[in-house]
């Protein structure tokens, strides 16, 4: 039998030397079958399609045009080209490896990744604002690149880190969202959109370049520049984001590393002096609308530099043989480490100035009475100008272990555990700095431990749980407990999934909620922990465009920013409920997509939410030329009921609760034509189509911050694979 095996392998190698150039995608299962057949002596002269000869990275050429030359004598001096080693990482399943290109993001705590498709379709192309991509998207203070907050309360970030930069997280790169790529060929993707006249123009430019050095090693560069000169006074913004990353996903060892840089330069308008300036259309040009900080020359400059390296190595608990393509199906232990450096800074400047509201109130004769005021009521450090700077830095080290008892997709797939140490540094002006001549730096150390377990029962059940605890020291007593499960049934080959999640947490106030000193605000607080219990249930049928969701939360001792823009803690419990429904109809190319969210808060003075929010998209999609040019023509509309929406404070960079003006009952409609011509996407869009046509004219999502008026947009996106 051994002799027969060696003869079979020898014949296999001879056939490889004369094989034609391989072009099929790598199928790990087929490769393993080929190895087993070879080991059993089962390969025949004509059966090499299951062996290494189908390696898609073997690009050797034997003939003049790449064809094999059967019957011709081979050059005995020609050096044999060694087949390139295929992608063997346990992170990727056979179906993922078979993709031409794919991307993923890494998990901060565990040895896991999240696969995501590369978006080159028309699905979200017409939504040119990144903060609009998820379900109903975010409420924004204006247009492209500006501060925003999620419509759905349950989708908002609850982290206490870098809270002053949170309004821009839909645009900024971070460890959680930086993409890593695996490409069969070098990949370049460029996007450019612009709108409006030159003096008011919005511009959106992106470029991504990625290349695999070998099947397991990739390098990529991402650069995004989103900004606007602004339709309204003092609304110019530059939002630039850069990510340079490297990934090696080998059979046992993996490393992910990235350098990230975010720069945001935002002029601050402070919002309109009164809603009448937008609703009554008394100004011919948006640039003439009076803003509360127009004369104050207010400005925010944010800078972020981040760098991380995440590594892990696998130790198989079973002997690996030539039949084992990856470690995913073996008992194994993985040991890993994460190092992260993350630093954000903010500089806010302004000067003393007043604004005048010409329609502040009516007198006894019914005529309008004007009122002159200042945006900020306090000038604590300098009565004429402001330059408030602050910075926050975190250096993180995490050591984690992952056990794989049987296989990665087993009933008990992975058991995770880890410990971490966060070194926090905060700096802001303090009164003692008058004596030292430099900003004081406050350093705090937080350490924590965490654990988790995940498993699957084939493709029908997915479950897991996790727990994180800060035992003592800074943030001592904080914890986060989570559990989830999903059940999938297949009817006519289509998945129907019911899923649920439960979480309970106790969270300390962020540093900036307890400590603040600037020209306009000062506080020293000692808040207690915020406690929250959540659960949600969802039912999805992707093939029929159906998603139903239900969220419930009870929050006690909620910490929020009140009407005076200062932090406050509610002494009781607040109950929040959200119900989400999505149904996409497709009638012979006519798409009628509906997303509706109902939210209820037991105390809208603590957690204000609109009762109903909706996003409707109606368009017709068709082929102009089959497999060459596909086109969408339609309308997008957004709406929410009236409520006391949050305001936005530029000096603090936070959203705060207010009870002065209501926002809502205004539809915001866009008309678009989008197309995909081979690898190119094209967009023609008129934003805010209904401006001045219908609606109450109050085009606001955040109190006193008007949305952009009507403007025409044109854009192009092109992918290159070579």
Can you say where each PLM-predicted feature lies in the sequence?
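Exposed, low-structure sequence patches enriched in small/polar residues
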Residues: 5, 12, 183-185, 294-357, ...
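Short hydrophobic transmembrane-like helices used for membrane targeting/insertion
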Residues: 7-9, 61
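Membrane-proximal, glycine/serine-rich, low-complexity loop/turn segments characteristic
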Residues: 25-305, 315-328, 490, 494-495, ...
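Positively charged n-region of N-terminal signal peptides that target proteins for export
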Residues: 1-6, 25
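N-terminal signal peptide c-region/cleavage motif recognized by signal peptidases
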Residues: 19-21
């Amino acid at each position: 039998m051994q002799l027969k095996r060696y003869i079979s392998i020898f014949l296999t190698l001879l056939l490889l030397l004369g094989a034609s150039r391989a072009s099929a995608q790598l199928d790990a299962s087929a490769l393993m079958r080929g190895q087993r057949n070879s080991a059993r002596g089962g390969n025949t002269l004509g059966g090499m399609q299951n062996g290494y000869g189908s390696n898609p990275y073997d690009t050797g050429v034997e003939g003049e045009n790449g064809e094999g030359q059967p019957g011709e004598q081979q050059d005995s001096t020609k050096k044999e080209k060694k087949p390139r080693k295929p992608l063997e990482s346990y992170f990727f399943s056979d179906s993922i490896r078979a993709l031409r290109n794919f991307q993923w993001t890494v998990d901060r705590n565990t040895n896991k990744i999240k696969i995501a498709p590369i978006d080159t379709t028309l699905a979200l192309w017409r939504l040119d604002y990144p903060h609009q991509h998820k379900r109903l998207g975010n409420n924004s203070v204006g247009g492209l690149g500006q501060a925003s907050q999620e419509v759905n309360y349950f989708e908002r970030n609850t982290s206490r880190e870098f809270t002053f930069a949170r309004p821009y997280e839909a645009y900024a790169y971070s460890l959680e969202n930086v993409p890593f790529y695996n490409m069969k060929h070098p990949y370049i993707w460029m996007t450019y959109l612009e709108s409006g006249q030159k003096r008011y123009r919005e511009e959106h430019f992106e470029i991504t370049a990625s290349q695999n050095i070998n099947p397991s090693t990739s390098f990529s560069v991402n650069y995004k520049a989103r900004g606007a000169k602004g339709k309204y006074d003092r609304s110019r913004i530059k939002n630039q984001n850069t990510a340079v990353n490297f990934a090696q996903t080998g059979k046992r060892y993996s490393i992910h590393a990235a350098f990230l840089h975010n720069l945001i330069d935002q002029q601050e308008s402070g919002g309109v002096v009164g809603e009448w300036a937008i609703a009554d259309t008394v100004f011919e040009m948006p640039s003439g609308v009076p803003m509360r900080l127009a004369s104050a020359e207010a400005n925010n400059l944010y800078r972020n530099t981040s760098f991380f390296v995440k590594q892990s190595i696998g130790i198989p608990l079973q002997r690996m043989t030539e039949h084992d393509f990856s470690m995913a199906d073996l008992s194994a232990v993985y040991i890993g480490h994460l190092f992260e450096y993350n630093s954000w800074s903010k500089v806010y400047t302004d000067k003393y100035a007043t604004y005048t509201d010409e329609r502040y109130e009516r007198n006894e004769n019914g005529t309008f009475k004007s009122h002159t005021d200042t945006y900020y009521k306090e000038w604590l450090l300098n009565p004429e100008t402001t330059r408030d700077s602050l910075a926050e830095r975190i250096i993180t080290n995490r050591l984690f272990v992952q056990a794989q008892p049987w296989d990665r997709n087993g009933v008990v797939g992975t058991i995770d555990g880890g410990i971490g140490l966060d070194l926090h540094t905060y700096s802001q002006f303090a009164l003692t700095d008058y004596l030292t001549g430099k900003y004081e730096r406050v350093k705090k150390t937080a350490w924590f431990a965490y654990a988790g377990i995940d498993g699957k029962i084939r493709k029908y059940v997915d479950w897991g749980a996790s727990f994180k605890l800060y035992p003592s020291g800074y943030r001592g007593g904080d914890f986060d407990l989570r559990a989830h499960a999903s059940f999938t049934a297949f009817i006519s080959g289509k998945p129907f999934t019911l899923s649920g999640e439960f979480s309970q947490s106790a969270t300390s106030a962020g540093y900036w909620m307890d400590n603040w000193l600037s020209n306009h605000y000062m506080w020293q607080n000692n808040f207690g922990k915020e406690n929250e219990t959540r659960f949600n249930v969802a039912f999805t049928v992707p093939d029929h465009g159906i998603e139903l969701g239900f969220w419930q939360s009870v929050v006690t001792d909620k910490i929020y920013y009140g009407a005076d823009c200062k932090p406050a803690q509610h002494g009781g419990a607040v109950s929040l409920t959200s119900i989400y429904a999505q149904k996409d109809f497709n009638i012979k190319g006519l798409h009628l997509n509906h997303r509706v969210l109902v939210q209820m808060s037991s105390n809208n003075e603590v957690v204000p939410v609109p009762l109903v929010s909706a996003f409707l998209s109606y368009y017709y999609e068709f082929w102009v030329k089959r497999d060459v040019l596909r086109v969408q023509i339609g309308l997008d509309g957004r709406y929410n009921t009236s409520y006391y929406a949050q305001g936005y404070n530029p000096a603090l960079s936070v959203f705060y609760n207010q009870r002065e003006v209501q926002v809502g009952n205004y539809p915001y409609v866009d008309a678009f034509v989008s197309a995909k011509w081979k690898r190119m996407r094209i967009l023609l869009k008129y934003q805010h189509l209904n401006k001045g046509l219908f609606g109450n004219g109050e085009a606001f999502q955040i109190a006193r911050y008007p949305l952009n008026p009507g403007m025409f947009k044109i854009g192009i996106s092109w992918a290159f694979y070579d």
